[in-house]
């Protein structure tokens, strides 16, 4: 969709004091429209200082997207603001600073949550190295991709959370949610379930009050059972160009993990070159 409608609101989620002395600023956004909005990199979507611009999203799904990417700065720049600017069509330009200092905004999910939840680890392909983090790694898809032809994208994931096995809630590993979405690119990306994806059925009868709270998997979503596994999705790109696919891996079925808790999930981004 063109950059029109209600403005995209950039959000600074918080700051992270990394063990190596660097500081990371976590950013998300709010799209108050009912449809996705695309804002290309440039004068309507940029980060200052300019050296940090380029890896922010250009595709904004409807609703609230929390902790989508980070900007990491060296210790020597920890006290300098990093600004994300967004302008939606004719709307007023909005900006938000990544800023270190306020303890209320410090994100400390390097430590386990009260019930043991931690960020899952995620890697590319079936055997790629797994890492945790809000912008854990950026990789290149090494296959040939043509516009209009489906391609399988694969990630491998593991939940390293250490939970109390005597607690009946944690007898079995918590399922992980894996969510593929367009991050950057000139055209549309259509996702479909891979044949390996198991689609959970609503376990409740229609008369049960819990029935309406069950959510079916969206086409870009996969549920991984057992604490470790592979997630595949089928993606079709509408036109040639350079794309990025964002994958969010979460363990939100745990009682101490959610977007509202600012923990626990990992983001990885895969670059895909699409030819005619």
Feature locations, PLM:
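Short, compositionally biased P/S/T/A/G/V-rich stretches that sit at domain boundaries
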Residues: 8-12, 103-145, 164
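Residue-level recognition of secondary-structure-to-loop junctions
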Residues: 17, 225, 232-239
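Low-complexity "stalk/linker" and mucin-like segments enriched in Ser/Thr/Pro/Ala/Gly
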Residues: 57-58, 171-175, 179-231
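Short acidic/polar inter-strand loop motif in beta-rich domains
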Residues: 88-95, 251-257
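C-terminal edge beta-strand
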Residues: 258-274
